[in-house]
Design a protein with these regions (language model features):
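Bacterial N-terminal signal peptides that target proteins for export
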Residues: 1-9, 20
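Acidic, contiguous N-terminal accessory segments
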Residues: 12-13, 20-145
Length: 146
């Protein structure tokens, strides 16, 4: 069921989203996130070279790596050593919650369960596709199903 939900959201994203999902001051994500705080500056897409995720989420993490390659033409290696995208399993208040932070150095995703990680991946993929392969805005997103 997790895979179908992810595919549905991706399909909806590709159908509805305009050419660019964010402008200088506006970021549009589907579904709309619960909380987003913009920060000054950006992260170059070129810095996204590696990813690390918990071993128990390996299959889903590897699917995301494939999606990045196929949909965004972005090659990312799976590594435990200093990843530019770091996914952490943490205790969250509710199921499916996640936090996604884009810093100058990379991306941090915190999720309490695999579904939260999938939701974070969906949000990150929208941001990457909307960036037109250049820069991601620095921000912190907190989200959960509503």
């Amino acid at each position: 069921m997790i895979g179908k939900s992810y595919i549905f959201h991706l399909f909806l994203f590709l159908l509805i989203l305009p050419d660019s999902i964010y402008s200088q001051d506006n970021i549009c994500l589907i579904p709309q996130v619960e909380s987003m705080v913009r920060k000054k500056g950006t992260l170059s897409i070129e810095r996204l070279e590696s990813i690390h995720f918990p071993d128990e989420w390996k299959n889903t993490g590897n699917l995301f790596v494939s999606d990045l390659k196929e949909l965004a033409n972005l090659s990312v290696m799976v590594t435990a050593s200093n990843p530019s995208i770091h996914v952490k399993k943490v205790k969250m208040q509710e199921p499916e919650m996640y936090m996604l932070e884009i810093t100058k150095q990379g991306i941090i995703i915190e999720a309490g369960d695999q579904t939260g990680m999938i939701r974070a991946f969906s949000t990150l993929l929208q941001l990457i596709l909307g960036s037109e392969g250049k820069e991601l805005p620095r921000l912190i997103i907190h989200d959960k199903p509503r």
